[in-house]
């Protein structure tokens, strides 16, 4: 291992002390900086370089929703950056139940250097950030999943060489992934089409916001239920589970409603020949995507999953490093 860092040759942004609650809060330049920093840290890691800008720093990780990728990538990431991650489950801390969110935020601010929270209500994350004096990172809510999309944008840029003008077609439920993808695509000048069945459309307020942002950045954000037309000329096809955590009772109805929205080999053939397939994982093989697609040569899902580590290392470095 070496401690020699490589020269940073991209435009830096000052983000120290900021919260990361939604991509709508960040400019195009700031998002591109985080992607460039993620690429830089990924290369450092692959080259065996020790880089510890968070030595002596501690991140509290609050999980009211369980996760594989979010916990492992954040905990591994802060360790690689020289810091410490403390896992707090719903048994250890109950946001808004018993002790108020405001009191929790103030107490944790006295112990920690940053908070990552994965929970249900976006309002709880915003309340935590309002009263915390340290950076708060949204690890997922029912409304947004910005950390995942930061890694997604990094992955698309790695494979396609750019973001501006890239056509991304999201197929499935109009959920937190859809919302954050729309905001990320709007900020970076992409053309995104969200394809959902009637009754599963994205949040109207978020869709309106994304379209407004898109107008400022030369992006296009659309919604349709016509899957065949949407995937034409697609550079990226993206999907997610049909029933998210907490929606298990709706599983049978959702399987019926989404049966014509599966990503399979014949669907990929309708897109560009060099289309890539993405999924935030975990995947339910045989439901929203076939095994042939997720394991096929056009799939980048495991590269995408790995980039959660590098994108979040970039985020923690930018927000928490001295």
UniProtKB/Swiss-Prot annotation:
Its EC number is 2.1.3.3. It is found in: Cytoplasm. It comes from the Bacteria. Pathway: Amino-acid biosynthesis; L-arginine biosynthesis; L-arginine from L-ornithine and carbamoyl phosphate: step 1/3. It catalyses: carbamoyl phosphate + L-ornithine = L-citrulline + phosphate + H(+). Carbamoyl phosphate binds at residues 67-70, 94, 118, 145-148, 280-281, 308. Signal peptide: none annotated. GO terms for cellular component: cytoplasm. GO terms for biological process: arginine biosynthetic process via ornithine; citrulline biosynthetic process; L-arginine biosynthetic process. L-ornithine binds at residues 176, 240, 244-245. It holds the Pfam family OTCace_N. Belongs to the aspartate/ornithine carbamoyltransferase superfamily. OTCase family. This is Ornithine carbamoyltransferase. The gene is argF.
